[in-house]
Structures are given as structure tokens and as C-alpha cells.
Amino acid sequence: MAVTYWTGENLTLRAIQPEDIVIFDSLDDEILRNMDSLHFPRSANNMREWVEEQLEKDEFRFIAVESDNNIVGMIETFDCDRKNGTFGYYLAVFEPYRGKGFAKEMILMVLRFFFLELAYQKVNTTVYSFNNPSIRLHEKLGFMKEGQLRKIIFTKGAYYDGICFGMTREEFELNHG
């Protein structure tokens, strides 16, 4: 299979569609905690409105699917600042697919597009201190730890830090060129 920006070796990134509300409605608590999105239950109508609002924004939101069309997770970009060339992203991988390289593939597809096609020069992301697998992944990908925001999220009955990671286009090309 040919590898393109949106089709990797093991998965494809596709746009979110209104019928995807069932995906957002079924996210497990661990994913929602990692995205700082643990909320009271929402009605199907509220979820549909939220998905439709997301479709109108400039940021990119993708659903990651395997070749057999199973949904692996999602990745979305935010704070896309063309003037300064910076952006951020959130990532979620569903429980049965964690630890199998899907997060790495999703991140690299988005970084490749933003750095090499849209000419952004820096990506920033924050990983919560309780998410050790994500911390290890970002370090392994060559992200630099740029700081730590103390006690920025309350979940599971405690406050946790946010670890700030960044990578420049030059670092990406050096590590993943």
C-alpha cells in the first residue's frame, strides 16, 4: 500500500463527520481525562451540535481507522498560528489499540503535513504527568521537554502537572526526515 499524508502503514486519518457522534459519546474515562474533557453526560442532540461546530473551525480533526475500518483513535490540531508558525495537538487512542504504535503513526502523519506542506515551524503539546506512556512516546519521537506546569488538572481525586513538549521543523527533519 502506498503511504500518503493521510494513509500510513497501519492506519488512515479521515475527517470527522456528523455521524461520528457515537465515537465521542463512547469515549472511555481514561481518554477523556487525558484530553481534559471529562464532563457530565450530554444528550445526542448536544453531541451532534458539538461535532457540527467542530467541522466549521480551522483546526484539523481526524479519526484514525485501520485498514478494516476499525476506529483506532483521533488526533486534532489547535492553536494553529500561521503568523508565528506554531500549532498544538491532542491525541487519543482507544484502549484496545494502545501500545501498538498507532499514536506514533498518527503524530508523525500530522507533523509531516504541518511542517513540510503548511510550512509551520514548531509544534507544542502538553502531556499530563500521570500519562507515562505518552511522556515516553514524545521523548522517543525527539520532542524536547520545555517546561512543567504545576498542578494544572484535577482528576482521579488529585492535581497533576502538565509536561510541555515542543519540536521544531528542523528537529523533525533531523529525526524523521
From Swiss-Prot:
The lineage of its organism: Bacteria, Bacillati, Bacillota, Bacilli, Bacillales. SUPFAM superfamilies: Acyl-CoA N-acyltransferases (Nat). Residues 11-170 form the N-acetyltransferase domain. Its EC number is 2.3.1.-. Pfam families: Acetyltransf_3 (PF13302). This is SPbeta prophage-derived uncharacterized N-acetyltransferase YokL. The keyword Transferase applies. It comes from the Bacteria. CDD domains: NAT_SF. Disulfide bonds: none annotated. Belongs to the acetyltransferase family. The keyword Transferase applies. InterPro entries: Acyl_CoA_acyltransferase (IPR016181), GNAT_dom (IPR000182). One of its GO terms (molecular function) is acyltransferase activity, transferring groups other than amino-acyl groups. Keywords: Acyltransferase, Transferase.
